[in-house]
C-alpha cells in the first residue's frame, strides 16, 4: 500500500511576517522557510504507518519553486522513500495544487493521501477537500487518530466540541490536525542519507495542468494593534470602571 504525502514550503512559524508598506503583499524576502507544521505531522503519520507494517511506500510531493527540494529532503530524512517535485515559480492556489496532486496520483495510484489541514501561510484549509472532490474519494479532514486496515481507514476527526470517528474506503484523503502525533526530530545523519534517496522532477505543463489563478488579492493589512491593558487596585475599582464603560 502506498501513501502520497503533500508537503508545502512555507514561512517558518516563528517568523513574524510584515506587510509591505504599500499593502500589496507580505515581505518574505530572506526569512526562514520550513515545512508546513501540519505537513510534518502528515509525514510522521505516514512513517508510523510504515513502521507498523501498514504501508509499504511513502512518496512525498511538493509543488513550487526550486527550494521546495529542501522541504522534500526533510520529508525523506523523516522516513519518506522517494520524492516528487512539481517545479514552478507561479503562485499556486489550493485548486491548482489539488489538480496537480490528482494528475500525479493518476500515475502513482496511492491508497492514502495525507495532507496538512492547512498551510500556515495562506491558511486556506481547502486543498484536501478539493482533492477528495476531484478524485471522488472519501475524506477525513482534521484527523486526530488514524487506523489503517486492508480496505478501509478509520479516522477520528476533530470537530466542534469533540471528535467524530469515520470509516472510509480506500483510496481516501486525510488531512492532519495538531493532535495526530508529535513529529520526530530530524537528525543530521538522516538528512545526509536523504540526499541519496530519489527525487523526481516534473512540472505543471508535463502533468497537463494549467496554472490559473482565480483569486485576486485586494490588499494586505497588519492586524490592529491591541490597546494596552490597565491594572486596577481593587475589585471595587474594577466594578466601577466596568459600570462607567457600560460593560455591566
Ligand atoms: P491549504 O489548503 O493551502 O491550507 O493547504 C492544505 C494542505 O495542502 C497543506 O498542509 C499541504 O499538505 C497541501 N499543500 C498545499 N499547497 C501545497 C504545495 N504547494 N505543495 C505541497 N503541498 C501543498
Model feature map: region roles:
Residues 1-248:
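N-terminal glycine-rich FAD/FM-binding segment characteristic of electron-transfer flavoproteins
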Amino acid at each position: 500500500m502506498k501513501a502520497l504525502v503533500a508537503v508545502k514550503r512555507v514561512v517558518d512559524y516563528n517568523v513574524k511576517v510584515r506587510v509591505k508598506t504599500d499593502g500589496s503583499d507580505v515581505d518574505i524576502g530572506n526569512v526562514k522557510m520550513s515545512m508546513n507544521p501540519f505537513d510534518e505531522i502528515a509525514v510522521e503519520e505516514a512513517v508510523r504507518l510504515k513502521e507498523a507494517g501498514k504501508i509499504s511506500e511513502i512518496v512525498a510531493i511538493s509543488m513550487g519553486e526550486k527550494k521546495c527540494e529542501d522541504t522534500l529532503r526533510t520529508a525523506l530524512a523523516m522516513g519518506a522513500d522517494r520524492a516528487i517535485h512539481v517545479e514552478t515559480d507561479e503562485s499556486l492556489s489550493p485548486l491548482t495544487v489539488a489538480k496537480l496532486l490528482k494528475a500525479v496520483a493518476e500515475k502513482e495510484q496511492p491508497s492514502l493521501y495525507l495532507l496538512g489541514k492547512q498551510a500556515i501561510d495562506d491558511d486556506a484549509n481547502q486543498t484536501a477537500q478539493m482533492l477528495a472532490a476531484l478524485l471522488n474519494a472519501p475524506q477525513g479532514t482534521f484527523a486526530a487518530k488514524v487506523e489503517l486496515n486492508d480496505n478501509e481507514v478509520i479516522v477520528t476527526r476533530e470537530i466542534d466540541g469533540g471528535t467524530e470517528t469515520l470509516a472510509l474506503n480506500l483510496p481516501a484523503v486525510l488531512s492532519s490536525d495538531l493532535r495526530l502525533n508529535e513529529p520526530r526530530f530530524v537528525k543530521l545523519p538522516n538528512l545526509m542519507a536523504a540526499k541519496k534517496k530519489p527525487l523526481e522532477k516534473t512540472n505543471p505543463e508535463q502533468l497537463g495542468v494549467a496554472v490559473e489563478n482565480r483569486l485576486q488579492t485586494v490588499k494586505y493589512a497588519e492586524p490592529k494593534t491591541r490597546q494596552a491593558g490597565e491594572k486596577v487596585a481593587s475589585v471595587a475599582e474594577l466594578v466601577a470602571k466596568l459600570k462607567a464603560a457600560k460593560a455591566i
